[in-house]
Amino acid sequence: MAERRLTGLALKVGPLGEHDRLLSLLSNAEGVSRFAVPGARRPRSSLAAAAPLTLLELQVGGRSGLARVRQLRVLRSFSGLGQQLETLAAAQALCDLCIQLAAEDPVEGLLDTMQLHLERLEEHRADPELVLAGTVQACIHLLTLGGYGLPLQTCCITGDPLEPPLGQWDWRCSLLAQDGFAIDEQPGAAIQLNPSELALLQRLTRAELPRRRDGELMGPPAVWRRLLRVVEIWSRTHLNRPSKALAMLRETLLAGA
């Protein structure tokens, strides 16, 4: 295998034998790739900096099998997210999502979007409500890039526009986990949203979090937890694996409520 240079985000790092580590890296060029990092478990190793949530520049190569990291340089570390359980769970959930979305092929824009949302988690780490809201929005952005976006504009049964009638509190839409949102209460719905909840969810496809005129985040924590549940259900159904990290985030926030 030819020697090459890669820049990417370390999504996951685990043990490999007695002294090595196995690195899962997200890059623009290759999507998610796995590399052996020889000697990285030795304290004085020059490769010991291969840690989760670090942006790395690597030189990799190898004759056959699992490619090996020859050299690495840390460009940026998001390791501070591990200091609080909420941000750790949020970051882990986003890393797991990237692994699922880019395991087979590169996804254009995924690395840049992931970095952006990790930066926002760092910025908001002292505010659990913003961590929760930012995680929900990040998941929606990543799912959309990966081809699994929530269909938020039309009813999955009738094709009619999903236009939540704000103030009409008896109106409901239902999440049918395989298909999307349907107007009215539907049998077999995984969860139902009222008009303001759906309107808030629809705004999360935009670049910034929805805020009121005074700059405060729109929506109370209970609503954001429901939107997190929507993301959990959709991801589990379409990626065929539940997110333990999202569940941990939800439970952690509930415990602190």
UniProtKB/Swiss-Prot annotation:
Pfam families reported for this sequence: RecO_C (PF02565), RecO_N (PF11967)
Gene3D superfamilies named among the record's database cross-references: Nucleic acid-binding proteins, Recombination protein O, C-terminal domain
Membership in a protein family: Belongs to the RecO family.
Protein purpose: Involved in DNA repair and RecF pathway recombination.
Keyword Cell membrane: no
InterPro entries found in the cross-reference section: ARFGAP/RecO, DNA_rep/recomb_RecO_N, NA-bd_OB-fold, RecO, RecO_C
GO cellular component term of the entry, any: bacterial nucleoid
A GO biological-process term: double-strand break repair
Protein name: DNA repair protein RecO
The entry's keywords: DNA damage, DNA recombination, DNA repair
